[in-house]
Amino acid sequence: MPLHKSAEKRLRQAARRNERNRARKKELKGVLKNMQKLIDANAAKSEVEAAYKAAVQKLDRLGVKRYIHPNKASRKKAQLTKALNNYTPTAS
């Protein structure tokens, strides 16, 4: 337990930041999983492109705000772009 008033405040701030960081990373994980799910489900190209756009926007935002490292955001965007460019829905 913190002994000083300022240490108590820092503990509260750290808890809030931790929760915020966890929520943002969880959102990112969901967006990335959504795109992968659409690719695996052989969805229409337009649906995959919409998911790609949402994922890139989320990666850009989190990279700029330093929730994730900017290089990681760039690497993930490159991987998503490659997956989108290689994606061709097969008729079933």
UniProtKB/Swiss-Prot annotation:
Composition bias, Polar residues: 82-92
Keywords: Ribonucleoprotein, Ribosomal protein, RNA-binding, rRNA-binding
Region described as Disordered: spans on this chain: 1-26, 73-92
Biological process per Gene Ontology, one example term: translation
Example of a GO MF term: structural constituent of ribosome
Disulfide bonds: none
Alphabetized Pfam families for the sequence: Ribosomal_S20p (PF01649)
Biased composition (Basic and acidic residues): 1-21
Transmembrane residue ranges: none
Domain of life: Bacteria
Matching HAMAP family: Ribosomal_bS20
Family according to the record: Belongs to the bacterial ribosomal protein bS20 family.
PANTHER family for the chain: 30S RIBOSOMAL PROTEIN S20, SMALL RIBOSOMAL SUBUNIT PROTEIN BS20C
Known function: Binds directly to 16S ribosomal RNA.
Stated name of the protein: Small ribosomal subunit protein bS20
Gene name in the database record: rpsT
